[in-house]
Swiss-Prot record:
Family: Belongs to the UPF0246 family.
Protein name (record): UPF0246 protein YaaA
Gene Ontology annotations of biological process type: response to hydroperoxide
GO cellular component: cytosol
Gene symbol of the encoding locus: yaaA
Signal peptide: none
Domain of life the protein comes from: Bacteria
Family matches, as Pfam families: H2O2_YaaD (PF03883)
Length: 257
């Protein structure tokens, strides 16, 4: 199985590293093209494009300017340890063993607006470039047109090399839109997490994001290889609902806390 997750806007470049091992992103040539485009933007333009504060716009203008392709542990950090959003709160990669990192390196991929596809141990320099942003580039009006089939081809390389039969889509819609499902050489499985509120089950963004991280960790902890094994997921009160699941979706519910 291959797990797909989204990146996070919140980054951590201060905490102690859980491992000193690293690899380098495989699509850095593409990243450099995007950096070239992003450097043309002033801080006010970044503010408008990303709908962020003056302070964040200044920070990201500086990040684009400072970005350079020679990554080391001094100027970059492993992606799975650098991202710190709700998904990564559930994943808790800072507590991985070396064996966990090994399994994740084979079976987990992070989709990224700037880096395309990241393996857990791939070094990355800090950035903010969400996949849905309309950054004009040589290939079109946004990042979906920029990446085209590149991300799908990169995922297929892993799928074909490892004989993977299933892709577990734990990414957000914004990021998964960069993948061409019909061109993937594997079957798609999408876990959906519903929380009860006022007697009704629905997707609550914060909880759903954390649950995607919890599910990723569950797969890694237990070295799972088959989709049916996902049905045993029961962390933090979630349970599998067979009746609600269909068409490649596995529905997990949790009663109101």
């Amino acid at each position: 199985m291959l797990i797909l997750i989204s990146p996070a806007k919140t980054l951590d470049y201060q905490s102690p590293l859980a491992t000193t091992r690293f690899t380098l992103p495989e699509l850095l040539d593409h990243s450099q093209q995007l950096i070239h485009e992003a450097r043309k933007l002033s801080a006010p333009q970044i503010k408008k494009l990303m709908n962020i504060s003056d302070k964040l716009a200044d920070l990201n203008a500086t990040r684009f300017h400072d970005w350079q392709p020679n990554f080391t542990l001094e100027n970059a950090r492993q992606a799975i340890l650098a991202f710190k959003g709700d998904v990564y709160t559930g994943l808790q990669a800072e507590t991985f063993s070396e064996e966990d990192f090994d399994f994740a390196q084979q079976h987990l991929r992070m989709l990224s607006g700037l880096y395309g596809v990241l393996r857990p141990l791939d070094l990355m320099q800090p950035y903010r470039l969400e996949m849905g942003i309309r950054l004009e580039n040589a290939k079109g009006k946004d990042l979906y047109q920029f990446w085209g089939d590149v991300i799908t081809h990169k995922l297929n390389e892993v799928i074909d090399a490892q004989g993977i039969r299933f892709v577990i889509n734990l990414a957000s819609d914004e990021y998964f839109k960069s993948v061409k499902p019909k061109k993937l050489n594997a079957e798609l499985i999408k876990p959906v997490f519903l929380d009860e509120k006022n007697g009704k089950f629905k997707v609550i963004s914060f909880y759903a994001k954390k649950a995607r991280g919890l599910m990723s960790r569950f797969i890694i902890d237990n070295r799972l290889t088959k989709p049916e094994q996902l049905k045993d997921f029961n962390r933090e009160g979630y349970f599998f609902d067979e009746e609600a699941s269909a068409n490649g979706e596995l529905v997990f519910k949790r009663h109101e806390q």
